[in-house]
Regions:
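Walker A/P-loop NTP-binding motif
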Residues: 102-107, 160-179
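Conserved Walker A/P-loop ATP-binding site and its immediately adjacent core
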Residues: 161-162, 177-205
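Inter-Walker segment of RecA-like/P-loop motor cores
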Residues: 204-239
C-alpha cells in the first residue's frame, strides 16, 4: 500500500509547476543559510536563486516570480515589524518561503480562472494515478472544493507566521479580483481557549487586528478583525456560551489551527465547510498523518457497488487534494530542527531498582545545560538561546486504582524522586553523582551499552572525578535555588484562580511549578502519602508562577504537568523534556 505522503497530488502538482519533483531539490538550491534575507531592493535572496537557476519547465515567467516575491517580502515585513523591535530581524527560512510561494501561485491561479485550474489539476491527477494501485487512486478534483488548502508543517516550523502572511496574501488576491465585498469575515478556529489567547497575542505582534469571540460581547461587530473562536463554542444552536454556526453566515475566510485535535473529525469539518461555503479556508497542522491513522476503516476504495467508503478513505482523498505544502516532521528534523529523541531502553529488570539513579542522570543532563548557558552566555548570544527549562509531561496525574493500590501517578513519581534527591539521606545523591561523574553507574541498555556513556562532556570538563560533593552543591544552587539539602515543599497556591502547585526547597525561591487540571486532588494524594522527604502545605498566592515562566525574572527551572499546558502554551526556554 502506498504511503499517505505519496498520495499528496496537489503538492506534487505544485512542485511540477516549478519544474521539480521533490522538496529535496528545492532544499539543495535554497537551504544555504547565506540565502536567508532580503537585499536593499526588498527582494529575497531566494528569488535570485530561483531566477538564475531555473528548473527544467517552470509554469510561470520570471516577471511573475518577481511579483510573487514582492508580495511575500511586503507581507513578511508587515507581520515582523513589531517582532523585530526585540532586537533580531526575522526572515523566512527556505521552507517557509516555499510555503508562501506556493500559496502565491495557487491564489493567483484560483482567482484568475478557477475552471482552468481545476482542469489542469485533473490532467495532472490522471498521470499521477498511474503510479498508484487502482483502489488507492485519487478521485477527481471538483471546482467547488478548490477553496480549501492545507499546510502540513512540523511544530516549531513557523506555522503562525505562515498563517499571518496567508491572511495578507488572500486579501491581496481578493482585492485584485475585486471580490472583497463578497466576503463577510475572517474567522480563526482553534482547538481550545488557550490557543485562542496565544493567537490573539501573535496577531497583535503582527499588527493584524484580532478579536476573541465573546458571546454577546460585540466581537462579531468588529469590522475587519480576525475573529478567534475555539471549535467547542460553535454549535448547531446558540447556547449560553456557544454560538450557532449560521450566525457567522457563509462567504468567510476560515483559518483552522489543528482542527482535528479540537473536535471529532466529521463534526469540525462540517462546521468548517459551512463557514467557508462560497468562501475559502486554510488549515494548518503538524499532525495530518496521525489524523489519518486515527481514522477508522481502510484506505482502499470500496469494492462493492453501494458500499460506503470508510472515514479513513474519505480523509485520505480530501487531504491528498488539499495539502499544498508538506514540511512534516521528517523534513523538519532532517534539516536539523526539532527534538533529538534519546531512547534509552534501560533493561526492564533495572528500571525499578535504578529509577532514582536514572532520573538523577536526567537531572544532571539538565544541570549541564544550565551550567553551560551561564558559563558561556556571551558566546551563545548570537544563537538566541533562552534560559533552559526542564519539563515533565505526565500521562497520569493521580492514580490509585482498584487493580493496584500502590500505583503511583507519573507526576507523583517525579515528586518522590525530587524529594529523595534533595534530602540526600546518607549521601545517596552525592554517591549517584559520583557514579555518573566517574562513569561507574552501570546503567545499560538491552545491548549492554552504557546509556549515559557520552552524556556529560561539559560536566566532566568542569568537575574532577573527586568533586561529586562540590558538584552536588552547585547543582542545588543552579537548579533548585538552594544552598543546602532540605525537604521538598509542595505548596498548593490558592487565590488568583491559578490552581497551581509551587515547588521549593525549604523557604528558598520557587524552582518549579506544577500545572494540572485538578491541583487539589493531587495535593490530597500527596498529603496522604506521608513522604518523609516532602512537606505538603497550601498558601494564598495571587501571582501565577506558570504565566511568568517566560519573564526574564522567573525563578522557575522545572515545569511539571499534564496535557493542560501542552496546547496553547509556547516557550523558547524548553530545553529538556
Amino acid at each position: 500500500m502506498a504511503h499517505f505522503t505519496d498520495k499528496l497530488v496537489l503538492g506534487a502538482w505544485m512542485l511540477e509547476q516549478f519544474g521539480v519533483e521533490t522538496l529535496e531539490t528545492f532544499k539543495g538550491l535554497l537551504a544555504d543559510p547565506n540565502l536567508v534575507g532580503f537585499d536593499e531592493e526588498n527582494t529575497s535572496l531566494f528569488h535570485y536563486e530561483l531566477i538564475n537557476k531555473p528548473f527544467r519547465a517552470r509554469a510561470m515567467s520570471d516577471d511573475t516570480l518577481r511579483l510573487y516575491d514582492e508580495n511575500i517580502v511586503r507581507h513578511w515585513r508587515r507581520i515582523t515589524e513589531r517582532r523585530n523591535q526585540a532586537g533580531s530581524t526575522l526572515y523566512p527560512l527556505y521552507f517557509q518561503y516555499l510555503a508562501l510561494l506556493f500559496t502565491e501561485h495557487y491564489l493567483d491561479r484560483y482567482f484568475t480562472d478557477r475552471a482552468t485550474l481545476c482542469a489542469d489539476l485533473n490532467a495532472f491527477r490522471e498521470q499521477f494515478n498511474t503510479d498508484l494501485p487502482e483502489r488507492e487512486q485519487i478521485e477527481p478534483f471538483q471546482e467547488r472544493d478548490l477553496n480549501k488548502l492545507a499546510i502540513w508543517i512540523a511544530t516549531g516550523g513557523g506555522k503562525t507566521l505562515i498563517m499571518q502572511v496567508n491572511i495578507l496574501q488572500f486579501q491581496h488576491y481578493l482585492a485584485r479580483a475585486r471580490r472583497a465585498r463578497e466576503f463577510n469575515r475572517t474567522i480563526l478556529l482553534t482547538p481550545n481557549e488557550g490557543l485562542s489567547l496565544q493567537h490573539k497575542e501573535e496577531l497583535d505582534l503582527a499588527g493584524i487586528h484580532g478579536d476573541l469571540f465573546v458571546k454577546d460581547g460585540g466581537s462579531l461587530l468588529s469590522a475587519g478583525a480576525v475573529e478567534i473562536i475555539d471549535i467547542h463554542k460553535l454549535k448547531e444552536k446558540s447556547g449560553e456560551v456557544t454560538v450557532a454556526v449560521e450566525a457567522f453566515e457563509s462567504n468567510n475566510l476560515v483559518l483552522v489551527d489543528e482542527g482535528h485535535r479540537g473536535a471529532g473529525g466529521e463534526d469540525w469539518m462540517a462546521k468548517r465547510n459551512q463557514l467557508c461555503d462560497n468562501g475559502f479556508s486554510f488549515e494548518y497542522s503538524a499532525t495530518f498523518g496521525q489524523a489519518i491513522k486515527a481514522a477508522s476503516g481502510s484506505e482502499l476504495a470500496p469494492t462493492r457497488a453501494g458500499q460506503s467508503p470508510s472515514k479513513r478513505y474519505k480523509l485520505v482523498q480530501q487531504y491528498a487534494r488539499c495539502i499544498l505544502f508538506d514540511y512534516s516532521y521528517k523534513f523538519f528534523h532532517a534539516d536539523g530542527y526539532g527534538k533529538d529523541h534519546l531512547i534509552l531502553n534501560l533493561k526492564e529488570e533495572q528500571l525499578a531498582e535504578q529509577r532514582q539513579l536514572y532520573l538523577s542522570a536526567c537531572l544532571l543532563a539538565f544541570y549541564q545545560q544550565k551550567r553551560l548557558f551561564a558559563d558561556r552566555h556571551k558566546a551563545l548570544l548570537p544563537y538566541l538561546l533562552a534560559n533552559p527549562l526542564w519539563i515533565f509531561v505526565g500521562g497520569k496525574v493521580t492514580a490509585k486504582n482498584e487493580a493496584n493500590a500502590e500505583t503511583v501517578s507519573d507526576i507523583h513519581a517525579i515528586l518522590q524522586f525530587l524529594a529523595r534527591f534533595l534530602a540526600n539521606r546518607g549521601g545517596e545523591s552525592v554517591e549517584f553523582l559520583e557514579l555518573l561523574l566517574t562513569q561507574r553507574d552501570d546503567l545499560r541498555d538491552e545491548r549492554d551499552r552504557r546509556i549515559f556513556g557520552k552524556a556529560f562532556p561539559y560536566v566532566q570538563t568542569a568537575w574532577a572525578t573527586s568533586q561529586a560533593r562540590e558538584l552536588f552543591q552547585d547543582l542545588l544552587q543552579v537548579v533548585f535555588r538552594a544552598a543546602a539539602p532540605g525537604l521538598l515543599h509542595v505548596v498548593h497556591l490558592k487565590g488568583g484562580g491559578t490552581g497551581e502547585i509551587g515547588l521549593r526547597v525549604g523557604e528558598n525561591d520557587w524552582f518549579g511549578v506544577i500545572n494540572v487540571g485538578d491541583a487539589a486532588k493531587l495535593i490530597k494524594q500527596l498529603d496522604a502519602d506521608r513522604d518523609s522527604n516532602m512537606v505538603v502545605t497550601d498558601q494564598t498566592y495571587a501571582t501565577s508562577l506558570f504565566e511568568r515562566i517566560n519573564k526574564p525574572d522567573s525563578t522557575i527551572n522545572l515545569l511539571v504537568g499534564a496535557k493542560k499546558f501542552t496546547e496553547g502554551w509556547s516557550s523558547w526556554r524548553v530545553s529538556t523534556m
